[in-house]
């Protein structure tokens, strides 16, 4: 009986501590600040440009061109396109379901100043190589190029609609990136666009291979 009572008290103490911490973390300190018109427009331009470039890079390819691999350990156009499409919805889900659900921390804004441009400049740079995590690697999720393209366009439209209309305080919520360190919600959105730009360049590398099928 004594053991059960001690355990129950300990559980109650832990619950109270957790509840107190949660209340402290979620108590608003300032009113939410939505994106500025300039921030929306800048992001939307980035997303539109990278969308158009990606779709142009995969348009009109034959099945041989779509599946050609420059080497056994390198991705085909189809595989790169799948990685872009998977990442599109996954990263947007991270913003909505993880980053924007975390407590606002406007005091961290100084930590991410200047990172908007850094993301847009460094992420597309193919001289810095990185390995995609297992859950973002291509596995043949879409049977055809048309199905993949539709999924990408649907995801991109959802993200752009969100940027266009949201009143979320994206600049006050943060999450660490393994390379860039802490980023705010807006910067994570920019990362989606910059990521597709990086891998569109990879598609062009595949197409430039001397053994790439002529038709």
Model features per residue range: what roles?
Residues 51-54, 152, 156-159:
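Hydrophobic alpha-helical core bundles mediating ligand binding, dimerization, or RNAP-core interactions
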Residues 58, 127-130, 167:
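Short, small-residue-rich loop/turn micro-motifs
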């Amino acid at each position: 009986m004594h053991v059960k009572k001690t355990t129950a008290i300990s559980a109650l103490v832990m619950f109270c501590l957790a509840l107190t911490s949660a209340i402290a973390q979620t108590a608003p300190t300032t009113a939410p600040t939505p994106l500025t018109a300039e921030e929306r427009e800048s992001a939307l331009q980035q997303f539109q440009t990278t969308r158009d470039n990606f779709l142009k890079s995969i348009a009109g390819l034959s099945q041989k061109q779509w599946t050609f691999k420059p080497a056994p350990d390198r991705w085909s156009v189809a595989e790169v396109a799948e990685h872009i499409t998977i990442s599109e919805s996954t990263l947007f889900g991270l913003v909505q379901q993880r980053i924007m659900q975390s407590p606002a921390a406007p005091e961290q804004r100084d930590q991410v100043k200047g990172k908007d441009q850094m993301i847009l400049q460094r992420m597309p740079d193919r001289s810095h190589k990185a390995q995609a995590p297992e859950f973002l690697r291509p596995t043949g999720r879409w049977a055809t190029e048309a199905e993949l393209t539709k999924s990408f366009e649907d995801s991109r439209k959802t993200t752009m609609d969100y940027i266009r209309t949201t009143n979320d305080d994206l600049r006050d919520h943060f999450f660490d990136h393994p390379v860039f360190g802490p980023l705010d919600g807006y910067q994570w959105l920019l990362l989606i666009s910059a990521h597709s730009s990086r891998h569109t360049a990879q598609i062009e590398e595949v197409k430039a291979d001397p053994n790439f099928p002529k038709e």
